Amino acid sequence: MLIVKKFGGSSVADKDRIFNVANRVIEDYKAGNDVVVVLSAMGKTTDGLIAQAKDINPKASKRELDMLLTCGEQMSVAYMAMALESLGVPAISLNAWQVAMHTTSVYSASRLKKIDTERIQTELEHRKIVVITGFQGINKYDDYTTLGRGGSDTTAVALAAALHADACEIYTDVEGVYTADPRVV
């Protein structure tokens, strides 16, 4: 069974939370499943990067902001792969360029067009947990683009579809279980 699991920034906000997620992921792996993990940036990393960018240039281009903002997810996936390896499980972190997540060229609000799954499939065949950056892609110029807020959820669902996954699990730390958008109901 192939499972795509997405965890948001608060789920990987610090070392303890990273290891908590790693242990949850390992349970599925040890049950014999192939596992792909999609992560957002840790905690408030994205907000911090935006604030720092505005301090440097309040009129920074969306292209440069996208280049900067992809760093948050790259940190998260590298830390997660390191945590998994420290727990004795083979893992690899991959970013949007390495996976070839092709998007439109609209900076800060791109749409996913195509995902090349070959690299992911190869790593899964080697029984590795594949940890992938959410929220980002690359355009036809090989520039990083971002999918906007909530983009990691989009990444997880798109990867699950492209990989023909058996399940796509999106974890969040809200109180209770919602069957509708609480802002609407």
Residue locations for each model-derived region?
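Nucleotide/pyrophosphate-binding catalytic subdomain
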Residues: M1-V185
